[in-house]
């Protein structure tokens, strides 16, 4: 029940009453140990527990070098608002630099400043923990062949609010631009045919979301495959979320998000298709969104512009509340998620919509 309470806490855009999850001692191929390393600095030590080498993908994990959600931060029983980015990474053509290689029993350390992705200006005592999944490849390989879960220890830190406030936020505020009221797209951020590409993606996202909502009501076998449940509560939530994405994708000035064709905040790191700032209800496309994926993909579970936009909309609290997280990437990992996590996972919605469109 504590884990369920934790999952209910995921993704809330403002602090709220929450139960801090206890950490079960499940066996994992890796061990993650957190330790305080300064006022708001945390050091994560990742150890390979096994007897064979592992190649660990950094994307959306405790090892991600970008300002992604690496840990959960609580204060007075409430989750502290996350101000960083939630990216969708391209999962094909992975290169070795996206991975961390760990030999048997070897460790690697990764440090990060919580104040760069959380508002800790109030200061005081906070509790920090990490939980997630790491896609794995064979030693020296770049093809994902499995995954391992991790659950860290919990640490308590006493934060000096003034020092935390002096830390520059990793993702600042975007400058206002010319907005197309029809789609809430900042047209001044678009170059060449990018506006046309994005408008097509928005239309396709609306169409796929509407079809997915219908399928959630009429195809219990497919709903079970992706969301691991077919009860009325699950159906209602899935349908509601897809319809919310459909409305946002076809918004006539009533949408709750702002969409940028291009990045002005430095979030388009290698491999990032698009990203969301949930604290600002803001979506940004990256160059490879236009160059490396098609408008629609007719391959089962293939990435495309439409489902990437759909994926990012589920990260926005103005569209989906509580907003979806990145708890598992790709079909194999999504298929392994329990119902409580599947319904809070952004890629579950993108893959389900693709499956209905393609007929997987």
From Swiss-Prot:
PROSITE patterns on file: ZINC_PROTEASE
Family: Belongs to the peptidase M35 family.
GO cellular component terms, A-Z: extracellular region
Pro-peptide region(s): 18-182
Positions that bind Zn(2+): 311, 315, 326
Location of the active site: 312
InterPro entries, sorted: Fungal_M35_metalloproteases, MetalloPept_cat_dom_sf, Peptidase_M35
Organism: Arthroderma otae (strain ATCC MYA-4605 / CBS 113480) (Microsporum canis)
Cofactor note: Binds 1 zinc ion per subunit.
Protein name stated in the entry: Probable neutral protease 2 homolog MCYG_04257
